[in-house]
């Protein structure tokens, strides 16, 4: 009644403007902001999924290439025949090394920027021969040498010294079931992990764990407390870590060629900065 009978024309116009224009504009603005925020969040998730897939693909391709290389070297027929047929005959083994192995090894070392070192450990010699062949005696109690008595696949490990190794059993030629040596190749971990190291999207962070749950690589975000919170969550949820909450987005993936898990995350504050920038 007051609005109809007593309010002045000016007040009626002001109130009408507020009701008919200002309030709808506020509601529309809030809705538009919310929609823009959600669209940016959706776009960020899609981009993160694509980035994670691409990083894993690139790294898997590197591991596949280097795995094929170790397999090729471990299958050298003439060298295997010499190694099993001339056990403890240093002269014969050295001749075979010079002819069939060392030139190939040096070729791979000089042409493959990821490869640092190769050695073959064998029980068929009592002393080291040439640049690559070593007696197995000093390594008989190591985990990797024991494991590769029965495990014939190429195994990738980051060991306590922080170095990346590919280890593969060298088998006899007659039955391909008896170990006559172990090929051990060391690779530059930082070069292998380059697809992850060069990823830079909204100041993203990355944690990589091997099959034993050991952290082998970390790319930290700017907020140290947020970093610790995310790493704690990963530690508590190693198998199903992907999450979207009010503080961060975390994506998880497993690599195909090695038993590694990739955790890729972004602080949501960096997304908000995109809205206000």
Where do the PLM segments sit?
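Solvent-exposed, extracytoplasmic
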Residues: 98-112, 178-223
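Extracytoplasmic/periplasmic sensor domains and loops in membrane signaling proteins
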Residues: 92-105, 129-161, 202-203, 214, ...
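Extracytoplasmic/periplasmic sensory segments of membrane signal-transduction proteins
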Residues: 46-150
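Generic short beta-strand
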Residues: 118, 168, 205-208
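Extreme N-terminal signal-anchor transmembrane helix of membrane signaling/transducer proteins, especially
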Residues: 1-38, 42, 46
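Conserved beta-strands of PAS-like sensory domains
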Residues: 138-141, 160-199, 263-267
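Extracellular/periplasmic juxtamembrane segments that couple receptor/chemosensory ectodomains to their
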Residues: 220-276
